[in-house]
Amino acid sequence: NTTGNYNVATGRLALTANTTGYNNTANGYLSLSGNTTGYRNSAYGYYTLQQNTTGGHNVAVGMEALYSNTTAYLNTAVGYRSLYLNTTGANNTASGSGALYSNTTGANNTASGYYALYANTTGANNVASGYQALYSNTTASYNTANGMKALYSNTTGSQNTASGYQALYYNT
């Protein structure tokens, strides 16, 4: 830390690279360790927001949540490896182990449940609620899936709504 202000770091190598970043909280081994100028981030758990450099206003709770995030803003990840591969995707919310795991640049997505929106990479404005809802979605946008494995096989189909157990399961 050189000129950063109002930072809190607990845990080995937490906030190690911080230079001018401010209002960050890092709690856990290597949490926010790559942060240089990012600000107003909260990281709780082993390797949370580990690769963040300049991203701000992110919240990561759970081992390796938002691990790959570098410059993205306004993301919330709660659960083991939620939003794990996210780098620049902004304004995403993931709750549940592996939720939005593969997301890289997709924005404005909400995933709640174990592996919900798991394969999403660039798809935007999707909502998935339930165990593996919208699991296979990669690039599709504007989908809503509520229920266990709803829209499970969907990869590129957009503007779909599915509600119930395995609703629109085979839609691609």
Spans of model-derived segments:
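Glycine- and small/polar-enriched repetitive beta-structure motifs of secreted/surface proteins
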Residues: 1-172
